Regions:
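N-terminal glycine-rich, Lys/His-bearing helix-loop that initiates the first secondary-structure elements
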Residues: 3-6, 28-74, 78, 89
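Conserved C-terminal alpha-helix-loop-beta "cap" of PLP-dependent enzymes
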Residues: 117-118, 307-385
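Active-site C-terminal subdomain of aminotransferase-like
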Residues: 175-184, 189, 222, 226-329
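Active-site phosphate-binding strand-loop segment of PLP-dependent enzymes
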Residues: 47, 155-213
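Conserved PLP-anchoring active-site segment centered on the Schiff-base-forming lysine
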Residues: 113-131
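Buried hydrophobic positions in well-ordered alpha/beta secondary-structure cores of metabolic enzymes
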Residues: 47, 87, 106, 137, ...
Length: 385
């Protein structure tokens, strides 16, 4: 099947002549990336991703506030120390925190602290580490990823058990880490007890539990719990904590809940090319995000906008919501003829082309008016066909 890099949008956004087409194999009917051409300069009206959103004003202000004078580089500055204290407030005193530039680095480097090249990491078939990190774990760690089928983005102990029979067998990759995503790639959320069951099973079998928390804030907001209650309190060993998807400009954090696992991480981060010389500009963002509940306000708002969108979409003929809307993602089956017309005005991803399933993401800066206008276009499209 051919998938566009960016569908034709009217003159005010994208011209058809600016579109490239590439052939892509449909692997298990999972998400295919179709981005606007790099030549495009004008901003899109987008429900594609929370990565498409801008930066929260408080974050910009925080960056500007530390942009004065000279400080010690590579994280030995007062701003980084202050940011780490904020993490201790939210996740507990007994944590080690390291800042990196992006989510792939957070995942790969965090995993590398637990995994040898002869090990395997067990995850879902839609896990970001398997689907959207360009084999980075395999390339930089040399480990094997073992993927489990899932309909809701979650994996369960019963599935994991089936892949532990090779423990101790020198001919087999040795399972060492279970990796889960919170909120999942399908917009669902693990409840605290679900995480604890997996963590207890992992530790009983001498495995570690890794959590990709790119949208952890959205999960906590959805569950109405503290960040600690779905990480440290339920047995997570290493966490990739996301900031970029929740209003930051850039930056993620790798959090270790077992200090021993972090013993060599400063070397791993440096070797992994993720040690920022001007660390204060990442640290200041995290301090702002974790102050005055900004992380919660941003995530809660994004979740609310996603639920509002889902409620409105359910009223549109021939559309079906396919996943529980528990965070800030809406998955829906929409007639293909709707999709092509909708994407003349809005950019979003086609998740499963065969089923005509799309993904819409709400962000901290999505407004009710944005949702209203989007749904209005869908309703008009439905009436016109």
């Amino acid at each position: 099947l051919a998938y566009t890099k960016g569908e034709a949008i009217k003159d005010d956004v994208i011209r058809e002549s600016e579109i490239k087409v590439s052939a892509t194999e449909d692997r298990g009917s999972r998400k295919r990336i179709n981005r606007p051409n790099k030549k495009l300069q004008k901003p899109l009206i987008s429900f594609a991703s929370d990565n498409s959103a801008g930066v929260h004003p408080n974050i910009l202000s925080a960056i500007n506030s530390v942009n004065q004078g000279h400080v010690i580089s590579y994280g030995d500055d007062i701003f980084t120390q202050s940011a780490v204290k904020k993490f201790e407030e939210h996740f507990g005193k007994d944590v080690e925190v390291y800042f990196v530039f992006n989510g792939t680095a957070a995942n790969v480097l965090g995993l590398s602290a637990m995994v040898e090249p002869f090990n395997s990491v067990i995850c879902s078939e839609v896990a970001h580490i398997d689907e959207d990190e360009c084999c980075a774990p395999e390339r930089f760690i040399g480990c094997k990823l073992v993927t489990l089928p899932t309909k809701d983005g979650k994996i369960r102990v019963e599935q994991i058990k089936e892949h532990l029979h090779g423990l101790g067998n020198q001919h087999r990759a040795q399972p060492k880490v279970i990796s889960i995503t919170q909120a999942t790639e399908l917009g669902t959320v693990y409840k605290p007890d679900e995480i604890k069951v997996i963590a207890d099973f992992a530790h009983k079998n001498q495995l570690f539990l890794h959590m990709d928390g790119a949208r952890l804030s959205n999960a906590a907001a959805s569950l109405n719990v503290k960040l600690k209650q779905i990480t440290a309190d339920v047995g997570v060993d290493v966490l990739s904590f996301g900031g970029t998807k929740n209003g930051m400009m850039f930056g993620e954090a790798v959090i270790f809940f077992k200090r021993k696992l972090a013993e060599n991480f400063k070397y791993i981060r440096k070797q992994g090319m993720q040690l920022a010389s001007k660390m204060r500009f990442i640290s200041a963002q995290f301090e702002a995000l974790l102050s005055n509940n900004l992380w919660l306000k941003n995530a809660k708002h994004a979740n609310e906008m996603a639920r509002l969108l889902a409620r409105k979409i359910e009223e549109v003929p021939d559309t079906t919501i396919t996943q529980e809307v528990e965070a800030n993602a809406v998955f829906a089956i929409v007639p293909a003829k709707y999709v092509s017309l909708l994407r003349e005005k809005y950019f979003f991803y086609i998740w499963n082309r065969e089923k005509s399933e799309v993904r819409w993401m709400a962000s901290f800066d999505t407004t009710k008016e944005d949702v209203r206008k989007f749904v209005n276009v869908i309703e008009k499209t439905a009436r016109s066909i």
